[in-house]
Design a protein with these regions (language model features):
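Rhodanese-like catalytic fold shared by cysteine-dependent sulfurtransferases
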Residues: 1-96
Length: 96
């Protein structure tokens, strides 16, 4: 990881809005068929979700469509939070 790394966050929009890697792009797994065409097959990127399951699904879909230019982050955002990777401040998404 470097500050110039491209990061794709496949969590739901609300999860991303609550807290995310500072430079990550929100691309929910539910809409992968919409955003997959925007991926540059020559540019490396990191792929993550909350814990690893959704990014594993996204990785399988990407690989099935010929993409090999990514690294799936094992453990997802939970593990990322334990590192020095900069994240946004948490914003509660619950409304009373």
């Amino acid at each position: 990881y470097t500050e110039d790394s491209k990061i794709i966050d496949v969590r739901k929009e609300g999860e991303y809005a609550a807290e995310h890697i500072a430079e990550a792009y929100s691309r929910p797994l539910a809409y992968i068929n919409t955003w997959i065409k925007d991926i540059d097959p020559k540019e490396h990127f990191f792929l993550h979700c909350a814990g690893g399951y959704r990014s594993m699904i996204a990785a399988s879909i990407l690989q099935a469509r010929g993409y090999r230019n990514f690294t799936e982050v094992e453990g997802g955002f939970g593990k990322i939070k334990l590192t020095e990777v900069p994240t946004t401040d948490f914003v509660c998404q619950s409304k009373l």
